[in-house]
Amino acid sequence: MNILQINSSARSDASNSTRVANSIVERLRASHPGAAVVVRSLAQNPHPVLDEAALGALFTPADKRTPEQTARVALDDVLIAEIQAADAVVIGVPMYNFGVPVQLKNWIDAITRVKVTFRYTANGPEGLLKDKKVYVAFARGGRYRDTPADTQVPYLKTIFGFLGMTDVHFVFAEGLAMGADAAEQAFAEAERDIEAALA
């Protein structure tokens, strides 16, 4: 098994979402001895935004790109190759102002490429990143699960489904800023979510 772990928190090793993602990866490795793990920390190695120059590079035929355009597309190619090779994708996601971190959005923009990770057909779009399990580890200071304030779940469900990844499991550590007891309970609840996701 090839496991791709994406850490999107700006807090590095102090990140709660990374802590939960690590727990998922540990369980996967325990049940799949010999699994290979690739870890990408998006805050420590930030990916450039999808700006006008990047769009220009992507829409320029490969044989007509400038060296700068070729280098820009190559950055995205690395991320695409990582997720194409993965059997399981584990993503640590904190909640920042009710959305996902900008570094995670940049990663999503990088891996979403027409004719590579999705395509348009006569019947509509078709995702090409199929047969992958996705585990999303959320860490939140408050409690927003199953409420209108949770914009993360519908967004990630939509974009991953668009890319062909429909086997998506969500793990929640919520209430982390609501006191020590609440934080302890949050991690216990996350472990229960992990057990259910891997059952």
Swiss-Prot record:
Cited InterPro entries: Flavodoxin_fold (IPR003680), Flavoprotein-like_sf (IPR029039), FMN-dep_NADH:Q_OxRdtase_AzoR1 (IPR050104), NADH:quinone_OxRdtase_FMN_depd (IPR023048)
Positions that bind FMN: S9, S15, N16, S17, M95, Y96, N97, F98
Needed co-factor(s): FMN
Pfam families attached to this UniProt entry: Flavodoxin_2 (PF02525)
Record GO terms (molecular function): electron transfer activity; FMN binding; oxidoreductase activity, acting on NAD(P)H as acceptor; oxidoreductase activity, acting on NAD(P)H, quinone or similar compound as acceptor
Enzyme Commission number: 1.6.5.-, 1.7.1.17
Alphabetic keyword roster: Flavoprotein, FMN, NAD, Oxidoreductase
Cofactor note: Binds 1 FMN per subunit.
Catalytic activity annotation: 2 a quinone + NADH + H(+) = 2 a 1,4-benzosemiquinone + NAD(+); N,N-dimethyl-1,4-phenylenediamine + anthranilate + 2 NAD(+) = 2-(4-dimethylaminophenyl)diazenylbenzoate + 2 NADH + 2 H(+)
Signal peptide bounds: none
Family per similarity comment: Belongs to the azoreductase type 1 family.
Subunit description: Homodimer.
PANTHER family the UniProt entry points to: FMN-DEPENDENT NADH-AZOREDUCTASE 1 (PTHR43741), FMN-DEPENDENT NADH:QUINONE OXIDOREDUCTASE (PTHR43741:SF2)
Record-given protein name: FMN-dependent NADH:quinone oxidoreductase
Gene: azoR
